């Protein structure tokens, strides 16, 4: 099982960028390999937050369509996930709050692989980032 981060659909629907083709290649490889892809509710919130912040609300729906179209499930955020994220933030000083929440959801669901271009995950042990 692989958790798909928000930057994957955002590169897919965004303007020309070197990661646009990389994101497409990663998804195609995972899907053709029969991998189970999931995301979490925080990823959907990140998409909303980012596009509102850069005044591109019209990009929210295409990004949602891109990710919902490839994942098998959107995992919820539970209280225990937030508590796990808090603990990770106190232990790993370079970890962002959003990344800590994804890591907590991954731990909750025994997921060790993450599709993301965010190098912030690299400092956390036990996570294999696919980029």
Curated annotation (Swiss-Prot):
Q: Which sequence ranges are marked TM in the entry?
A: none
**GO MF annotation, one:** RNA nuclease activity
Q: Which residues form the PINc domain?
A: 2-128
EC annotation from Swiss-Prot or TrEMBL: 3.1.-.-
Q: Kindly list the GO CC terms recorded for this protein.
A: extracellular region
Record localization: Secreted
Which residues are involved in binding Mg(2+)? 5, 99
What cofactor does this chain's UniProt record say it requires?
Mg(2+)
- Keyword terms, alphabetized: Hydrolase, Magnesium, Metal-binding, Nuclease, Secreted, Toxin-antitoxin system
- Per the similarity annotation, which family is this? Belongs to the PINc/VapC protein family.
Relate the protein's function as given in its record.
Toxic component of a type II toxin-antitoxin (TA) system. An RNase. The cognate antitoxin is VapB13.
The protein's name in its UniProt record: Ribonuclease VapC13
